[in-house]
Regions:
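Non-catalytic, polymerase-adjacent accessory regions of viral genome-replication enzymes
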Residues: 1-82
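Duplex nucleic acid-engaging cores and interfaces of nucleic-acid transaction enzymes
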Residues: 16, 118, 122-132, 136, ...
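Short runs of predominantly hydrophobic/aromatic residues within well-ordered alpha helices
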Residues: 17, 21, 36, 49, ...
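Residues in well-ordered beta-strands of folded domains
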Residues: 25, 57, 105-108, 118-120, ...
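Short alpha-helical scaffolding segments that buttress acidic/His motifs in well-ordered protein cores
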Residues: 52-56, 130, 207-212
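A contiguous, low-structure linker/loop signature
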Residues: 62, 70-114, 125-133
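Short beta-strand-to-loop capping motifs
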Residues: 75-76, 121, 286-290
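Conserved polymerase palm-domain catalytic core
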Residues: 91, 100-101, 110, 142-312
Length: 312
């Protein structure tokens, strides 16, 4: 479909995206070692851009502008949606698209504290949304059942229900983890290594890196580099964070897979610990059937695994 052709309707775009996502997920599931190339054409495919735009436009942040001062309403009323998407697609195809710094705002919290809010430009949000449409079905094939945060068809209540169930199954200790400044501290090089396990398309890898390095424009007007972490408030950030934090999921899943129900009973009789991980984004618990010393050892083990991603 060329830039002069009519853009697909919303229904047509959703159907095409779902069809391609289903194929990507199936291919990733069938071959756990497959590295995907030739994905950059999907990022600028009209159907993917239409779906990405609709998701950005329907988001509650659509009325908020990034560093360029443009909101989703401005795009609709002044630029025209098709022209906006056509211009964005042309830049992506010509490889002249460059993410802009994230606009930072400090939001008051109860108790006098403030939290940082990052606001990307509408253009950057659309490209991030399109990237997510392509990458998510691939990495979903690898994500473990113990991960519940920011995943399709999963929610916090599911994680809570799993914890309640496991707590009724002889798990006596709970190791609670809250990863310090997770979204700010993830190592770019370590994250890049994990993305490259599945993605061989240099254009896609370059786009991901460009968003990671886009920088932040503070309220004082000063621009700061982003040498660690995922884009503040970015549509792509939860997926990238899950890719990084799945290092913990994989570590525990690998250990769990080696232990059959009979072996777990044998471990219990021998005084060895049995344990399960439940993670929701940057919060996790390890439920332990064993002693306090064993629970503390698993806490240290978790910290060591997360340390490989620059986290503590």
């Amino acid at each position: 479909m060329n830039t002069g052709a009519p853009w697909p309707s919303a229904d047509e775009a959703e159907a095409r995206v779902l069809e391609i996502q289903t194929k990507l997920h199936q291919w990733a599931t069938d071959d756990p070692d497959r590295r995907f190339s030739d994905l950059d054409n999907l990022i600028c495919d009209p159907a993917f851009l239409v779906v990405a735009w609709r998701r950005v436009r329907s988001n509650r942040g659509a009325r908020t502008a990034g560093v360029d001062g443009e909101t989703a309403y401005y795009v609709t009323a002044k630029l025209g949606e098709e022209q906006f998407l056509a211009d964005l697609r042309a830049k992506l195809k010509a490889r002249t698209f460059r993410p802009q710094p994230v606009r930072e705002r400090m939001i008051p919290k109860p108790g006098g504290k403030r939290r940082r809010l990052g606001i990307a430009t509408v253009r950057d949000r659309v490209v991030q949304a399109s990237l997510k449409l392509v990458l998510e079905p691939i990495f979903e094939a690898d994500f473990k059942p113990c991960s519940y945060g920011f995943r399709p068809g999963r929610r916090a209540h599911d994680a809570i229900a799993e914890i309640h169930y496991l707590c009724s199954r002889s798990y006596e200790w709970v190791v609670e983890g809250d990863i310090k400044a997770c979204f700010d501290e993830i190592s770019h090089s370590a994250l890049g290594d994990r993305v490259r396990r599945r993605i061989g398309d240099k254009r896609i890898l370059g786009l991901v890196k460009a968003f990671l390095k886009a920088g932040i424009l503070g309220e004082d007007g000063a621009e700061r580099d982003t040498n660690t972490g995922t884009p503040q408030g970015g549509i792509l950030s939860p997926l990238l964070s899950n890719i990084a934090l799945s290092v913990l999921d994989e570590h525990f899943a690998e250990a769990w897979a080696k232990v059959t129900p009979r072996a777990r009973e044998t471990r219990r009789r021998q005084g060895l610990a049995n344990y399960r991980l439940i993670r929701y984004a940057d919060d996790f618990v390890v439920l332990v059937a064993g002693t306090r010393v064993q629970a503390e050892s698993l806490r240290d083990e978790s910290a060591a695994v997360l340390g490989t991603m620059g986290l503590s």
